[in-house]
Amino acid sequence: MKRARQAALALLVGGIAVVGGDSSGGAQAGAQASCTVSIAVANVHVASSSTYVVPGTLTHACGAISASWDMLQGARLISSWFLWSGGSTPLSEGQSDKAYFYPSTEPLGTYQASPNSADDTNYDALPQNSYQFSIKVNSRISISGYRSAKNVYVRARVTQFNPNANFGLGSWTNSQGRSVDFYQNRSGWKRVGAKTTGKNGYTAYLKVLSPARRSYRATVSPTPTNWDQTSTAISR
C-alpha cells in the first residue's frame, strides 16, 4: 500500500512538472506572437510637380527576414514598400524602403501603409501594423493691414501649390474657401477673429480695436488636401 501511494505521488508530481513545462513554452510562443512587425511613414508636403520619394521605416523588426506593405489611397494601390534581409539574418529596426508619389496623376489626402506579408526565419507569417499618413499640397499665407485711429484692419492672402497648373509643371494658385484665423500679440498671441478667402485668395479686412501699436499674424487652417501655414508677423 505504501509503495502504491509513493508511485501515485510520483506520477502526480511528474504530471505537474510536465504541465509546468508546457505552460512556459506557451508563454514564450505567446510573447513572440505578440510582437508586430511595424513600419512608420512621414507625412508628405507637396510643393513641386516632381516625383516624391515616400520612405517607409521599420520601427519593430520582430525577427522578420522580409516584410512588405502596400501604399493605398482608399482601395487604390499607389506604390509599395518591400524590406528584405537577404534571407539569412533578420531585418534591423531603422531599415527603410522607398515608395513613390506622382503629384500630377495621383490623389491627395489620407494614405495607408497596409500590411502585405512578413515572414520570420522559418518562413512563418508574422503580424504587421497598418500606418496612416497624409499627402497634401503646401499652403502659403501673407498678412497685410493698416491703422485708422484706434482701429487696425488686417487681411490675408492664401495660395496653394497646384501640381496640375501651368501645363502640368505646377504653380502657386489662389486658394479659395480657406478659413483664416487672425492673432494679435499682447502678452502672447491671442486670436482676434477669422475670415474666409474668396476666389482671389484674399480675405475681407478684419477690424480690430487696438489703441496701441501691436503685432499681428494669420494662420490658414488645414483641409483634407491642404496643409496649414502661419504668416510672418506685421506691426500696426
Residue map of PLM features:
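Bacterial N-terminal signal peptides
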Residues: 10-20
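Bacterial N-terminal signal peptides that target proteins for export
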Residues: 1-11
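Low-complexity, Ser/Thr/Pro-rich intrinsically disordered linker/stalk segments at domain junctions
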Residues: 2-4, 19-80, 85-236
